Curated annotation (Swiss-Prot):
Subcellular localization, as worded in the UniProt entry: Cytoplasm
GO molecular function, a single term: ribosome binding
Record-level GO BP terms: ribosomal small subunit biogenesis; rRNA processing
GO CC list: cytoplasm; ribosome
Function: An accessory protein needed during the final step in the assembly of 30S ribosomal subunit, possibly for assembly of the head region. Essential for efficient processing of 16S rRNA. May be needed both before and after RbfA during the maturation of 16S rRNA. It has affinity for free ribosomal 30S subunits but not for 70S ribosomes.
Annotated PRC barrel domain residues: 103-182
Keyword rRNA processing found: yes
Family: Belongs to the RimM family.
PANTHER family hit by this protein: RIBOSOME MATURATION FACTOR RIMM
InterPro entries per the UniProt record, alphabetical: PRC-brl_dom (IPR027275), PRC_barrel-like_sf (IPR011033), RimM (IPR011961), RimM_N (IPR002676), RimM_N_sf (IPR036976), Transl_B-barrel_sf (IPR009000)
UniProt protein name: Ribosome maturation factor RimM
Biological source species: Vibrio campbellii (strain ATCC BAA-1116)
Free-text comment about domains: The PRC barrel domain binds ribosomal protein uS19.
Domain of life: Bacteria
Amino acid sequence: MSMKGKETMSNEKIVVGKFGATYGIRGWLKVFSYTDNAESIFDYSPWFINQKGTWVEYKVESWKRHNKGMVAKLEGLDIREDAHLLTNFEIAIDPAVLPELSEDEFYWRELFGMQVVTTKGYDLGVVSDILETGSNDVLVVKANLKDAFGQKERLIPFLEEQVIIKVDREAQRIEVDWDPGF
């Protein structure tokens, strides 16, 4: 696979979308966005594609809505054959391009690995995943090996003030009002 983008060294990236099939003969690709507002994917630049274990940088030359989706033209990809090589590759961005948040806000990715503790001090485990259920998100908490309640995993609804009492980014800790037996 030829790499027309620029290689980068930083390995921490955030996947924000995926390329679909080529569109036309001039190097355009269909884009499937994972961002809340689909068009927001184009607010982030540059994009990175993991090609054979190396993050390769690409810049969007142009994009447009097409039918119910979106298509993009990347700099340096001028023919269908070159663009076809990126079909089904995930689109990632550098975390540094994300907007800075206020002290009481956070990105979901920051919650992974945080310790989850009840208001009474019981250590429930660490956040291993977050499920989007539609009504509210749910923390998947991997329990400690010697959990007194025999739990391996807990599903805790992310309901601020009702269940989630405090998220402390600095201490890497989430305080919850939750029964450890659940």
